């Protein structure tokens, strides 16, 4: 059986943890940041865990993570 291909776009967006979960960046922290509070921007700069309902799709896109 041939090797599975990794979707490079997903590999750049998600990182696997040691327990098999995936981490992602939060949205709304790219531009138009002037009116957002420092507290909100600090929160948006942290990583989030991919929801378990989406984790299976991410796992298919990154088979060797």
Swiss-Prot record:
<protein>
    <recommendedName>
        <fullName>Large ribosomal subunit protein bL35</fullName>
    </recommendedName>
</protein>
<dbReference type="GO" id="GO:0003735">
    <property type="term" value="F:structural constituent of ribosome"/>
</dbReference>
<comment type="similarity">
    <text>Belongs to the bacterial ribosomal protein bL35 family.</text>
</comment>
<keyword id="KW-0687">Ribonucleoprotein</keyword>
<dbReference type="InterPro" id="IPR037229">
    <property type="entry name" value="Ribosomal_bL35_sf"/>
</dbReference>
<dbReference type="InterPro" id="IPR001706">
    <property type="entry name" value="Ribosomal_bL35"/>
</dbReference>
<dbReference type="InterPro" id="IPR021137">
    <property type="entry name" value="Ribosomal_bL35-like"/>
</dbReference>
<keyword id="KW-0689">Ribosomal protein</keyword>
<dbReference type="GO" id="GO:0006412">
    <property type="term" value="P:translation"/>
</dbReference>
<dbReference type="Pfam" id="PF01632">
    <property type="entry name" value="Ribosomal_L35p"/>
</dbReference>
<dbReference type="InterPro" id="IPR018265">
    <property type="entry name" value="Ribosomal_bL35_CS"/>
</dbReference>
<dbReference type="GO" id="GO:0022625">
    <property type="term" value="C:cytosolic large ribosomal subunit"/>
</dbReference>
């Amino acid at each position: 059986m041939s090797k599975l291909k990794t979707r490079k776009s997903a590999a750049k967006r998600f990182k696997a943890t040691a327990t098999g979960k995936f981490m992602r960046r939060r949205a709304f922290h790219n531009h138009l940041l002037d009116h957002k509070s420092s507290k909100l921007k600090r929160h948006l700069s942290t990583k989030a865990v991919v929801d378990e309902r989406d984790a299976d799709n991410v796992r298919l896109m990154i088979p060797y993570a």
